[in-house]
């Protein structure tokens, strides 16, 4: 579906790393769906499944099923094929 972002970002309002990832995505105009795991029980369960029981954020999930968990800016830029 063309209107559906390829990336789902699971994060939390209190998480500085989640804010950092959102800023990087926003600054490069990369569309994503944001789910706050403290406000969305289904999102919290998804993160726990992806991370083997841990509520690790930020967790990014691509449409192809690939994931990045708590990535550095450099690791995220490499995955996105962008320059910092």
Describe each region flagged by the PLM.
Residues 51-61:
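Structural micro-motif
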Residues 2-3, 45-48:
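Short secondary-structure transition/capping segments
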Residues 47-51, 79-82:
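Short amphipathic alpha-helix with an adjacent loop that forms part of the alpha/beta core around
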Residues 30-44, 54:
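Thiol-based oxidoreductase modules, predominantly thioredoxin-like and allied folds used
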Residues 62-84:
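Non-catalytic, surface beta->alpha helical segment in thiol-disulfide oxidoreductase systems
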Residues 1-31:
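Local sequence-structure signature of Cys/Sec-based thiol-disulfide redox active-site neighborhoods
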């Amino acid at each position: 579906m063309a209107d559906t972002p390829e990336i789902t970002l699971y994060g939390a309002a209190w998480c500085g790393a989640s804010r950092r990832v959102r800023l990087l995505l926003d600054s490069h105009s990369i569309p994503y769906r944001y789910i706050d795991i403290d406000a969305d029980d289904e999102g919290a369960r998804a993160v726990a499944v992806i991370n083997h029981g841990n509520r690790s954020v930020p967790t990014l999930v691509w449409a192809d099923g690939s994931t990045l968990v708590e990535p550095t800016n450099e690791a995220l830029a490499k995955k996105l094929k962008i320059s910092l």
